[in-house]
Regions:
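Acidic, His- and aromatic-enriched active-site or binding-groove loops in soluble protein domains
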Residues: 1-21, 26-36
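Active-site and substrate-binding clefts of carbohydrate-active enzymes
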Residues: 23-34, 38-41, 52-56, 62-275
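Conserved NTP/Mg2+-binding pocket subregion across the NTase superfamily
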Residues: 49
Length: 275
């Protein structure tokens, strides 16, 4: 709530309570609570993988809740429409909107679109709960195997482990750079490191390293290259900043460890065969 957010959407597989269609659960966030919506993974994936038609989708929604008010949350990547599936923004989204408009003109208002904030106002609060760690690509089998993020941080995936080790090094260096950026030169390089860190954490690099069966050396290396810039600029900021000699020495050790990890990642990318 400190950032102005009032609700969030999580994967349906992360719901630890009876499936909500007529109440909105809450999630404890520090001293306050956020409304939490759980994505209907089945219905959402039917759209994402072109397993439904606009008419089938709307007919299915019409039956939810019987005669009572109920809601369904569908969510997917925006690039699903037009990028992953050519013309899907017209063949599905546009067609679904036209069907709804036609139904409403005939006085059939059973299915309506709504913003999440409208649902928070319309439906009563449910339980305050702790969702399971999960993602939109997590299955119940993954949760049972204690693998909540199989495409991004899978147990047993050596490359994932190396990638996150490198992330830890870069985040530590960037934080140290900001903390001791007491000169104009140090502030300049600390700002560059901070600016590069956010895109450097993009999830595609881990997704393409998942081997389920996704594998793309160039996409993995693109993320590594962005993080390299974080480490480089953070190291320069620390060198020109006001840190103590001991802190600067520890930063040099951290850079050396980061270089070892980076080289290990590059060896995997150069030498290991695709799955």
């Amino acid at each position: 709530r400190a950032t102005g957010h009032e609700w969030l959407i999580l994967s349906g597989v992360g719901c630890p309570a009876p499936w909500p269609i007529d109440k909105v659960h809450r999630f404890s966030a520090g001293d306050s609570e956020l409304a939490v919506f759980f994505r209907d993974d089945v219905r959402s994936n039917r759209i994402s993988f072109r397993k439904t038609t606009p008419q089938e989708f709307i007919d299915d929604l019409s039956a939810v809740g019987g005669n009572n008010d109920a809601y369904v949350v569908t969510a997917m990547d925006a690039e699903t429409f037009g990028h992953h599936i050519t013309r899907w923004e017209r063949e599905f989204l546009g067609a679904a909107f036209e069907l709804l408009t036609h139904q409403h003109r005939r006085g059939a208002n059973r299915v309506q679109m709504a913003f999440p904030s409208q649902l928070v106002d319309h439906f009563p609060a449910g339980e305050t709960l702790v969702p399971y760690a999960s993602s939109w690509s997590t299955s119940n089998d993954d949760l049972a195997a204690n693998d909540p993020f199989p495409l991004w941080q899978a147990p047993g995936n050596t490359l994932h482990a190396l990638q996150w080790e490198y992330v830890d090094h870069c985040q530590d260096l960037a934080a140290t750079a900001r903390r001791y950026a007491s000169t104009p030169e140090a502030k300049k390089f600390a700002a560059i490191a901070t600016e590069k860190l956010e895109p450097g954490l993009h999830s595609c690099q881990f997704w393409w390293a998942s081997r389920r069966p996704m594998w793309d050396v160039s996409m993995i290396h693109r993320g590594l290259s962005l993080l390299n810039e974080v480490a480089l600029n953070a190291a320069r900021a620390i060198a020109f900043g006001g840190a103590s000699p001991r802190t600067k020495q520890e930063a040099r050790w951290r850079v050396a460890a980061a270089n070892d990890t980076r080289q290990a990642i590059e060896r995997v990318l150069m030498e290991e065969a695709a799955p």
